[in-house]
């Protein structure tokens, strides 16, 4: 409301932000701009609602060789650990200071050896001097460039689920999460098959959002293009963020030998969401010591969880229902 303008500007100044009143809402359906006493723009609301000239593009989604997605990714555990997908990227992480602002909840690598990579970034919300909070945000990303190159729909769809799964493994409630996307594609020109790639990818993100009830706020495209015969590969990165108390943030490294290890999964969306909800409830009740969102197979998960505290893993094939787990929450 107009009477709140001064209070709003004062609140912005307290946050070191500049704020100015730049317009007044009127009953007349016209946008009028003045400069030095002269009217420099006078446009009707009807014209603004057209959003300019109507544009159309032909789209053709090409056939996909999805058999490529079913091929084994790695020939051995050593190959997996040495791959770009599964390597720790520790050298890259150490080029950045994760302690700036003293708000970090999770270090980039956990455990006494600092060898288990964190799957999320967790940091306390900034507050004014003299204030304190235990409220943090957790943020995670999802992207598989190989999947997106083969099938942009599958790659983008899975990117959303991967980013959300990492939040759940950190202790967050997926129902409170929001998304943002960063996408890169080749120059589209007037070629329907090129238009089909971003079309498929965005359709994949929409389907995933509708299934999870999560909204995407904004997006970013900063590296799309084509240079001579070199095209930017189809890429869609999903970023997910959710609020979480600092004391409820989970780190992924195994904490102590003898702890049982469970696999939470779902064959379809509804069963997967039920698994996520069961894990979240257990985490809030202090029953979860460590969690990892499976991204590149179970082997990668247990290897990374083992590195931080040098705790091994022995598998035993036993089925446990979520009902059974809930019965043991107390």
Give the predicted meaning of each segment.
Residues 1-328:
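Glycine/proline-enriched, intrinsically flexible loops and inter-domain linkers
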């Amino acid at each position: 409301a107009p009477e709140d303008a001064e209070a709003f500007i004062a609140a912005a100044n307290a946050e070191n932000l500049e704020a100015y009143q730049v317009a007044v809402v009127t009953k007349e359906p016209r946008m009028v701009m003045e400069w030095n006493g002269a009217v420099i723009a006078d446009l009707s609301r009807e014209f603004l609602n057209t959003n300019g000239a109507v544009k159309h593009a032909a789209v053709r989604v090409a056939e996909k060789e999805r058999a490529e997605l079913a091929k084994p990714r790695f020939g051995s555990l050593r190959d997996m650990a040495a791959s770009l997908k599964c390597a720790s990227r520790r050298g890259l992480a150490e080029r950045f200071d994760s302690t700036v602002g003293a708000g970090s909840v999770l270090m980039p690598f956990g455990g006494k050896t600092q060898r288990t990579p964190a799957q999320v970034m967790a940091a306390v919300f900034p507050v004014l001097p003299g204030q304190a909070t235990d409220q943090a945000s957790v943020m995670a990303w999802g992207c598989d460039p190989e999947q997106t190159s083969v099938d942009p729909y599958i790659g983008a769809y899975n990117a959303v689920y991967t980013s959300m799964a990492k939040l759940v493994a950190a202790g967050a409630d997926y129902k409170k999460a929001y998304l943002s996307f960063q996408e890169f594609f080749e120059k589209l020109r007037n070629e329907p098959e090129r238009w089909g790639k971003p079309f498929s990818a965005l359709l994949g993100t929409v389907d995933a959002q509708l299934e999870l009830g999560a909204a995407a706020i904004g997006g970013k495209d900063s590296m799309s293009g084509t240079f001579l015969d070199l095209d930017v590969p189809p890429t869609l990165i999903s970023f997910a963020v959710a609020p979480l108390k600092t004391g409820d943030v989970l780190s992924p490294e195994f904490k102590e030998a003898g702890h049982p290890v469970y696999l939470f999964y779902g064959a379809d969306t509804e069963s997967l969401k039920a698994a996520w909800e069961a894990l979240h409830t257990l985490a809030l009740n202090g029953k979860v010591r460590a969690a990892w969102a499976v991204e590149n197979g179970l082997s990668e998960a247990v290897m990374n969880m083992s590195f931080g505290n040098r705790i091994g893993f022995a598998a035993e094939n036993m089925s446990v229902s979520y009902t059974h787990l809930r019965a043991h929450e107390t």
